[in-house]
A protein has these predicted regions:
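Polyanion-binding surface elements
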Residues: 1-14
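Short, charged/polar, Gly/Pro-enriched secondary-structure boundary elements
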Residues: 32-36
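Conserved beta-strand positions that form and line the central face of beta-propeller blades
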Residues: 26, 37
Length: 70
């Protein structure tokens, strides 16, 4: 999947960019509080893209992906 297509999909879920990292951008869903890194590659594997979308769209946040201070 193209990175830009993944970004469009997660932004349509209501996710926002929270920071730029060295090799990844971090997006957070303010409704669930879940954050996920998005790699800065032109192409992102389909399995990884589906995992990112599933995690950010999930109504139940996963403990390891949520920071307590957010």
């Amino acid at each position: 999947m193209k990175r830009i297509d993944l970004i469009r999909q997660i932004e349509s879920l209501g996710c926002i960019l929270i920071r730029h990292g060295a090799k990844h951008d971090w997006y957070r869903n303010p409704n669930t509080g879940v954050s996920q890194p998005i790699p800065r590659h032109r192409e992102i594997g389909e399995i990884l893209a589906r995992k990112i979308i599933r995690m950010l769209a999930n109504a139940e946040p996963d403990d390891k992906n949520v920071r307590a201070d957010q």
